[in-house]
Amino acid sequence: MRILGIDPGLQTTGFGVVDIDGQQLRYVASGTIRTTSLALGDLPGRLKILFDGITELAARYQPDAAAVEIVFVNVNPQSTLLLGQARGACITALVASHLPVAEYTALQMKKAVVGHGRAAKSQVQEMVRRLLHLPALPGTDAADGLGLAITHAHVGPAMGRLGAATPLNRRQHAMYKGGRSY
């Protein structure tokens, strides 16, 4: 199974692609999508860069599923709203690419990757490096994307066995494709 992990951000969105075969994780790719070439006020342009970038990643790597970080409520409500819009562009691109989308909080990802939810970014980077046998630490945004993919590799199958649905389940995907399911 191939999983695409996305750490959304309006200026920098991290991504990671991981294959899982049984309990074996294998690194495929990671990096960032940057929108900093545009002015801060060009929100529609930045969202389009994110949408196009995620769509391209889905086409290039052909993942079976995607995992996206859930937005945390920031002290600054404007920042939270902007991050939510960036996240929406990412999720829309994934759904348009016909991918099932699971969502995890940063705390859930840190717990799955490091072992406790209050881990520092440097700890996430180091554990991602170890779990995927990387020669060097990935950047923080890419490490978060990889961490989300790893989280889904470990938690997603268990959720399926327990019958829990991801936020965008098959019925919802059918609705997005133009079908109806009640």
Swiss-Prot record:
Homodimer which binds Holliday junction (HJ) DNA. The HJ becomes 2-fold symmetrical on binding to RuvC with unstacked arms; it has a different conformation from HJ DNA in complex with RuvA. In the full resolvosome a probable DNA-RuvA(4)-RuvB(12)-RuvC(2) complex forms which resolves the HJ. Signal peptide: none annotated. One of its GO terms (molecular function) is DNA binding. This is Crossover junction endodeoxyribonuclease RuvC. GO terms for cellular component: cytoplasm; Holliday junction resolvase complex. Disulfide bonds: none annotated. CDD domains: RuvC (cd16962). SUPFAM superfamilies: Ribonuclease H-like. Its EC number is 3.1.21.10. It is found in: Cytoplasm. It comes from the Bacteria. The gene is ruvC. GO terms for biological process: DNA recombination; DNA repair. It catalyses: Endonucleolytic cleavage at a junction such as a reciprocal single-stranded crossover between two homologous DNA duplexes (Holliday junction). It comes from Verminephrobacter eiseniae (strain EF01-2). The RuvA-RuvB-RuvC complex processes Holliday junction (HJ) DNA during genetic recombination and DNA repair. Endonuclease that resolves HJ intermediates. Cleaves cruciform DNA by making single-stranded nicks across the HJ at symmetrical positions within the homologous arms, yielding a 5'-phosphate and a 3'-hydroxyl group; requires a central core of homology in the junction. The consensus cleavage sequence is 5'-(A/T)TT(C/G)-3'. Cleavage occurs on the 3'-side of the TT dinucleotide at the point of strand exchange.
